Every structure is written in C-alpha cells, then in structure tokens.
Amino acid sequence: MLDKTKRYLVVGLGLLGGKYALELTKAGFHVDGINRSEGHLQYALEHGYIASGKTHDFEDLVSSADHIIFGLYPTALIEWFRTYGHLLKPGCIFTDVSGVKTGLVEPVQAMCPAGVEFMASHPMAGRETSSVEHAAEVNFAPANFIITPTEKNTPEAIQWAKDLAEVLGFHHICTLTVQEHDKMIGYVSQLCHAIAVSLMCANDNSSLCEYTGDSFRDLTRIARINDKMWAELFLWNKENLISEIDQFDAALQQMRAALVADDRNKLEQMFRLSTQRRAAFDKKLPE
C-alpha cells in the first residue's frame, strides 16, 4: 500500500502524465507538476490534477519529491536527468511511462545519485488524442501495466510500482525484463501502429470515407498518431520492429501467393488459424 504522506511529482503533464496526476490526486496524494507548456500546466492546476506546478525554476519541487513520474519521451527523459537528476533526494523512487526501455533504463540508472532508484514501467494505455486536456478520458482498468526491473532494482521499488499501478486502477500488472518488454512491444503495439499507418498511406482516394465500414474504422483507429512520439519509439526499437515487420510481410505474402494460385484451401486454413488465435486471445483479456 502506498504511503499517502509521500509527495509525488509529475514531470511532463501530457496525456499519461496528466492521467497519473489526476488519479493520484483523486486517491488523496499530494501531487505537484512540472511542464514545459504554461497552458497545459494551468489546465492541470485549474482542474485539480495537481496542487502546484512550474514551468521553470522548479528545483525545489524536484528536491522535495519522494516519488517522480516522468511523462517524457525517452530522449527528453535522459536529457532532463542529466541536468536535474542530481537534485533527487536519497530514498526517491521514480518511474516513467515510456513505451521503449532498451537504451533508456541502463543510462538513467547509471546516473542515479546514491539512494535514488529508477523503477521503469510502462502503462499500455492511451488515446489517439494527446495532451492533458484528454487525460481524464484514458481508461486504465482494462490496460496492462508492465514493470521492467533490472538487477539494480530493490524488492521495495518493485512493490512500489505494483502498488502504484493498483492505485492508478490497472487490473492487470505483470513483470518483464527490459529486453522481453521491447521484443513484445514491437509486435503487440508498434507493428499494429505500423500496419494502421501504412494502410492509411497506401491509398490517397479522398472519397474513401464515403464507403468505409466498421472494419476499416476499427483497423485504422490508431492511425491518428502522435508523429513525434511514435517516430522516436519506432527508431529506438527498430531492430525488434523490423523483425516483426518481416514476419508480418511473410504472412501477407503467403496470402498473396494463395490468391495468385486460387488456393482456397490455403486461404481457409489461414482464416481458421486466425479465428482460433483470436478466440484464445479474447479468453485471456483482462476484465
């Protein structure tokens, strides 16, 4: 159970950072915020997401925080930590929301002052829209919360991350290594976004919206995308993503070959396999 006397700081009040701030405040924790945009900071203040916040001269907020949530892109988090990481006080445990861990966790842990611990985690939730104004619309309950400990993490920090996830409302919490996380995310998240984006880029017919049905809308929902964030995540995990794209391309080529050969049996076989795997997936979805 989380200690409600501890002070929380959210650095980066975007969609997920804003949601963390909102849920922690609703649960009775003291939450401060740091954000580059004055407008988004004011929104968080006016709507009660945070108790106080700053866009600059925020060293006092950093040094007084018991726990910090970084809602920053990986590159920005590393740059921020190089500048301000020395301000974190001993005993501070902090986490992130980044969708990629390789290249992030090791350098940040190496920069941690004595007694400070980076417990990396990934809330697999979001929306097509970004910014703190949409944070309240995010639903953590059906989403996965992935904790990625290393040998530098203590049992106390791992338990803190689990307790944090429960307070935030996640119903499914799991633990993976950094490498396992990035390989898995390359398939279940990044490949899906790559397919949706490619589908939208494959046809420039401006009249498509007049004829599409639910299948097209469902498949391309995530194609409305934060270009800067996803470009960074794709490039940071490019080896895993390229591997998954190659496997997907091989499966698509099998279907193409079946069409060229008028191979009805092969098509039906692929459809049955897809149906079976989707049914098994549905049974395992968190409620």
Stretches found by the model and what they are:
Residues R36, L72-Y73, V97:
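Short beta->alpha hinge that forms the Motif I/post-I loop of the SAM-binding pocket
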Residues M1-S63, H67:
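NAD(P)+-binding Rossmann beta1-loop-alpha1 motif at the extreme N-terminus of oxidoreductases
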Residues R7, H30-D32, E117, N144, ...:
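Residues at the starts of beta-strands that form the adenosine-phosphate
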Residues E137-I222:
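Internal alpha-helical scaffold of NAD(P)-dependent oxidoreductase catalytic cores
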Residues W80-E133:
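Rossmann-like NAD(P)(H) cofactor-binding subdomain of soluble oxidoreductases
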Residues F58-L88, C92-I93:
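Rossmann-like NAD(P)-binding element
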Residues S207-R277:
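Interdomain hinge/lid region at the active-site interface
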